Design a protein with these regions (language model features):
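Cytosolic/nucleoplasmic/matrix-facing N-terminal domains/tails
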Residues: 1-76
Length: 76
């Protein structure tokens, strides 16, 4: 099964956007983007922050936020 991190990372790479650019544009720290793309969710203080970052990141990449959050809920 495809994960949220894989979908986001693949889309970012298809758009040829670096982690530094994504971080600068979204104001999400690079380390958090790496955690999300690696499906490492334990470093986040709360699920509210995690879901907020996923939403911002998905919107930035032009993905359907509802589908991405549903995928997150389905796999966690």
């Amino acid at each position: 099964m495809v994960t949220v991190g894989e979908v986001l990372k693949n889309k970012r790479k298809n758009l040829r956007r670096s982690l530094d650019l994504v971080s600068a544009d979204t104001k999400i720290q690079k380390r958090f983007i790496k955690y999300i793309e690696s499906n490492e969710f334990s470093p986040f203080e709360s699920e509210v922050f995690l879901k907020g970052f996923i939403k911002i990141y998905a919107e930035y990449l032009g993905l359907d936020v509802k589908k991405i959050l549903a995928l997150y809920r389905k796999t966690h």
